[in-house]
């Protein structure tokens, strides 16, 4: 079992879609905390997102979602997650800090919470 599951519901985003997905996966590759899997549920009509994912050496679960209901796409990604902590991210999201997952895990465990949200802002807890 992984500590984190990164759940990514992907869909058509035009010519920017593959670029944004690459930027997201690059930000995951730079993380100091590496005990995670990546779960992509891809609702796009072409193979661009799948081809981007092939360039990375993560533990991947890739699902090609043939439907047209965005909330189902998100649920498919979430339902395939095996990690203790699930971090949903969209294909145009990135981690700004290389220690983001490490920080999320630390705060999550310190607070003993069941839900946590993250931001690029430092909040007092």
Predicted features by range, described:
Residues 65-81:
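Glycine-rich, basic loop-to-helix element that forms the pyrophosphate-binding segment
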Residues 2-7, 37:
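Cell-envelope/extracellular polymer assembly enzymes that use nucleotide-activated donors
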Residues 35, 58, 81-84, 101:
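Active-site acidic short loop of glycosyltransferases
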Residues 25-64:
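Acidic donor-binding segment of Leloir-type glycosyltransferases
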Residues 99-125:
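Conserved donor NDP-sugar-binding/catalytic core segment of glycosyltransferases
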Residues 13-30:
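Short, well-formed alpha-helical segments that are part of the catalytic scaffolds
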Residues 21, 25-26, 75, 83, ...:
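Short alpha-helix within the catalytic core of nucleotide-sugar-dependent glycosyltransferases
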Residues 84-94:
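Short beta-strand-to-loop acidic/aromatic patch adjacent to the donor-nucleotide binding site
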